[in-house]
Amino acid sequence: MYYKVLGQQNADAETVVLSSGLGGSGGFWQPQLAMLSAHFRVVVYDQYGTGASQGSVPAGYRMEDMADELAGLLNALNISRCHLVGHALGGIMGLHLALRYPALLQSLVVINGWTVLNSQTRRCFDVRRNLLLNSGVDAYVQAQPLFLYPGDWLSEHEAFLQEERQHQVANFQGMENLLHRLQALMDSDLTTSLKGVIAPTLALSAKDDLLVPWSCSADLASRLPHGEHLQMGYGGHAMSVTDPDTFNPILLDWLQRQASHPSGTPSDFIPVEMP
């Protein structure tokens, strides 16, 4: 998989891994890179089958497969302990990673995530999937900002949105890849397994998120042994993009609080074959 390692390179630097949502591209985290790189070693990557991580995502693909792919990448980089920050799909993948490799995660941040798919999120995914299947890639990409950003922010960033639309159409992950990744996300159900997540976990929500109601994050945190819920009042589903001035200090404070409080007992790290 395509990745970049940024920031601190000293031997005792702690590592923060950034995992994006359904789009999969590490470029999503641009507003956080400078801030995080000043304090941590930062790993940012394109998920398998997206961006520069070329490949065909098979039918029957699961969130567990995504977790194993990231574990394999980190093993190849000799990273046996890290903080993981995941947005939506990336955060839910992080929960699966925490269950499969408990010694790997020092802490976890799940941004606008959930325990099991909410009816509102399912409704939005069904609309987006129907757009893709019935109207094509450009229509899917054109509609995507409606689910990600607040209305006033959309009105004020027309040039950005046009540039983003062109870029996303040109670099689209492919219909089958997206549909298989989306199905894996929709099928994930952590209702009975969250008690096994030993890593301290921040469930961070946005009150005005159209795609994932903030109550999903509150529910998620309440089910975790070491869960905490924080809420931003503004920013939509992609509040790390729309309001980094609020988001970044929240994220940095959490990571710095967890840096000196490792969770669990390190055990042998299991190598995973890369796809």
Curated annotation (Swiss-Prot):
GO terms for molecular function: hydrolase activity, acting on carbon-nitrogen (but not peptide) bonds, in linear amides. Keywords: Hydrolase. SUPFAM superfamilies: alpha/beta-Hydrolases (SSF53474). It is an enzyme of class 3 (hydrolase). Its EC number is 3.5.1.-. One of its GO terms (biological process) is nitrogen utilization. It catalyses: carbamate + 2 H(+) = NH4(+) + CO2. It comes from the Bacteria. Residues 15-116 form the AB hydrolase-1 domain. The keyword Ribosomal protein does not apply. PANTHER family: AB HYDROLASE-1 DOMAIN-CONTAINING PROTEIN (PTHR43433:SF10), HYDROLASE, ALPHA/BETA FOLD FAMILY PROTEIN (PTHR43433). Involved in pyrimidine catabolism. May facilitate the hydrolysis of carbamate, a reaction that can also occur spontaneously. Belongs to the AB hydrolase superfamily. Hydrolase RutD family. This is Putative carbamate hydrolase RutD. It comes from Pantoea ananatis (strain LMG 20103).
